[in-house]
Amino acid sequence: MTHLLGVVGDPVAHSLSPFIHNGWLRAHQIDAVYSAFEVKAGELVSGLQSLSSQGVIGLNVTLPHKEEAMRLATSVSGTAHRLGAVNFLVRREDGWIGDNTDAPGFGLTLDFGDIEVSGRNVFLLGAGGSARAVASVLADRGARLTICNRTVGRAEDLARDLAPGARVRSLDEGLRKLSSAALVVNTLSLGHSGGRLELPPSAGGIFYDISYGKGAEAALKEAREKGWRALDGLGMLVAQAAISFEHWFGIKPDMAEAHARCRKLVEATS
C-alpha cells in the first residue's frame, strides 16, 4: 500500500518539501508519495479530517497553521510545548501526534556548516515564531546572544521564555552593533516585502538568513558586499525534512545530495 505524506499550509505551492522528500523516497525505494496540500487559515480542523480519511500518515505544517496544529494534536512533544508551535504531525489511531523540527533543524544546520556559537557574540534579528526556535538553540549552546526587534517588548518576551541570559536591543540599535558579531541570524521577512537591511562591514562574520531564493537575495547580496560570509536557509529546510523523514521511516537520508538538488533548482528558477 502506498503511504501518503505531505505539507499543509497557505500558500504552499512554492514549497520544496515534495521535491526533497520524493527524491529520498525514490532513492530508498519506499512506496510512498509526498504532496503539497493547500489548507486555508481557519480550516485546519476540516483539512486534517479530510487528509486522515484519505489515508495520510504524516504531515509537515507551515504557515499559518503551526499554533493551531498544536491545539489540535492529541499529544505534543516537549520541544513543541516549549516553542508554542507544531510543524510536524504523525497520525495514530487516537489522533495526530505533534512535534516541532524548527529547533533541531536549526541545530543540525549549525552542525552541518561547522558553525560554533558557544561563547561567541551572536545577534538574532526578529522575535517571531522562527526566532523562538533559533533563540532556544543558541541559548542552549551557550552563545552570547543579543535579540533585536522593532518591537522591543516581543524580544523581551522571547528572551524571558527561551533565552534568559540574552541581551535585548531595538532593531536599529542592534544593527549598529553587528560588527562585533561572529554570527547574525536574520529571521525578518524584509526580503519578501521589498525591505532592505543596512548591514555594517564585517571582518569574516557569518550572516545567516533563514529564507532562501528571492526572499533572501537582497540581504545576502548586502552581506557579501560588506564582507560577511553569507548563507541562506536552504540548509535548514533540508535539515528539517531529514528529521521528518527519519521520524517516519527510520532512515537518515542524504542531506548533502538533497541540498545540492535544491540549490540547483533554486538557482535555475531565481
Swiss-Prot record:
Q: Which InterPro entries does the annotation name?
A: Aminoacid_DH-like_N_sf, NAD(P)-bd_dom_sf, SDH_C, Shikimate_DH, Shikimate_DH-bd_N, Shikimate_DH_fam, Shikm_DH/Glu-tRNA_Rdtase
- Pfam families attached here? SDH_C, Shikimate_DH, Shikimate_dh_N
The region annotated as signal peptide is: none
Annotated shikimate binding sites: S15, L16, S17, T62, N87, D102, Y212
Phylogenetic classification of the source organism: Bacteria, Pseudomonadati, Pseudomonadota, Alphaproteobacteria, Hyphomonadales
Using the record for this protein, list the coiled-coil segments as residue ranges, or answer none. none
Q: What does this protein do?
A: Involved in the biosynthesis of the chorismate, which leads to the biosynthesis of aromatic amino acids. Catalyzes the reversible NADPH linked reduction of 3-dehydroshikimate (DHSA) to yield shikimate (SA).
Designated name of the protein: Shikimate dehydrogenase (NADP(+))
The active-site annotation reads K66
Q: Which cellular component appears as one GO term in the record?
A: cytosol
Against SUPFAM superfamilies, the record matches this protein to: Aminoacid dehydrogenase-like, N-terminal domain, NAD(P)-binding Rossmann-fold domains
Entry binding sites for NADP(+) = G126, A127, G128, G129, S130, N149, R150, T151, V152, G153, R154, I210, G233
Gene that encodes it: aroE
Q: Which GO terms describe its molecular function?
A: NADP binding; shikimate 3-dehydrogenase (NADP+) activity
Query: What does the record note on quaternary structure?
Result: Homodimer.
Family membership, please give it.
Belongs to the shikimate dehydrogenase family.
Reaction catalysed by this enzyme: shikimate + NADP(+) = 3-dehydroshikimate + NADPH + H(+)
- Give the E.C. number(s): 1.1.1.25
Q: Which PANTHER family does UniProt cross-reference here?
A: BIFUNCTIONAL 3-DEHYDROQUINATE DEHYDRATASE_SHIKIMATE DEHYDROGENASE, CHLOROPLASTIC, SHIKIMATE DEHYDROGENASE
Q: Name one GO biological process term.
A: aromatic amino acid family biosynthetic process
Highest taxon in the source lineage: Bacteria
**Functional pathway:** Metabolic intermediate biosynthesis; chorismate biosynthesis; chorismate from D-erythrose 4-phosphate and phosphoenolpyruvate: step 4/7
Which CDD domains does this one have? NAD_bind_Shikimate_DH
| This protein's UniProt keywords | Amino-acid biosynthesis, Aromatic amino acid biosynthesis, NADP, Oxidoreductase
- Species this chain originates from: Hyphomonas neptunium (strain ATCC 15444)
